[in-house]
Structure formats: C-alpha cells, structure tokens
Amino acid sequence: MKILSVLLLALIICSIVGWSEAQFTDVSCTTSKECWSVCQRLHNTSIGKCMNKKCRCYS
C-alpha cells in the first residue's frame, strides 16, 4: 500500500511539472492540426493541441 501511495504522488508531481511546459496562445482553432504551424511560428515547436478552441503549444 505504501508503494501505491508513493507512485500516485510521483504521478501527480510529474503531471504538474508537465503542465507548466505548456504555452498558451490567443489563436482560435477547431482541430489540433491547425495549431502545428502556429506553434512552429510562435514558439519554435511543432507540438501543439487545440484545447477549448485555443491553440496550446508544448516544448
């Protein structure tokens, strides 16, 4: 049971750190494919996702 608690805590910490790497944009979108060129142009990365109708870029 202790190991499960430690693994759960590690997962939560890693998730929080991962979220901080996201960079938000004000560019509207309907599909994630639309964000790829936006992220490349604005943040020099092609990893992007459409969330809540806004592009979100990851490094």
Curated annotation (Swiss-Prot):
GO cellular component, as recorded: extracellular region
Key words, A-Z: Antibiotic, Antimicrobial, Calcium-activated potassium channel impairing toxin, Disulfide bond, Fungicide, Ion channel impairing toxin, Neurotoxin, Potassium channel impairing toxin, Pyrrolidone carboxylic acid, Secreted, Signal, Toxin, Voltage-gated potassium channel impairing toxin
Domain of life of the organism encoding this protein: Eukaryota
Sequence similarity: Belongs to the short scorpion toxin superfamily. Potassium channel inhibitor family. Alpha-KTx 01 subfamily.
Cysteine pairs bridged by disulfides in the record: C29-C50, C35-C55, C39-C57
Domain notes: Has the structural arrangement of an alpha-helix connected to a beta-sheet by disulfide bonds (CSalpha/beta).
Compartment annotation: Secreted
Residues annotated with Pyrrolidone carboxylic acid modification: Q23
UniProt xrefs under InterPro entries: Scorpion_toxin-like_sf, Scorpion_toxinS_K_inh
Site residues (Aromatic residue of the functional dyad), renumbered to this chain: Y58
Tissue specificity note: Expressed by the venom gland.
First and last residue of the signal peptide: 1-22
Gene Ontology molecular function: ion channel inhibitor activity; potassium channel regulator activity; toxin activity
Lineage: Eukaryota, Metazoa, Ecdysozoa, Arthropoda, Chelicerata
Site entry: Basic residue of the functional dyad: K49
Gene Ontology biological process terms in this record: defense response to bacterium; defense response to fungus; killing of cells of another organism
The protein's role, per its UniProt record: Potent selective inhibitor of high conductance (maxi-K), different medium and small conductance calcium-activated potassium channels (KCa1.1/KCNMA1 and others), as well as a voltage-dependent potassium channel (Kv1.3/KCNA3>Kv1.2/KCNA2>Kv1.6/KCNA3>>Shaker/Sh). It blocks channel activity by a simple bimolecular inhibition process.
Protein name (Swiss-Prot/TrEMBL): Potassium channel toxin alpha-KTx 1.12
Chain residue ranges for the region called Interaction with Ca(2+)-activated K(+) channels: 48-55
SUPFAM superfamilies (alphabetical): Scorpion toxin-like
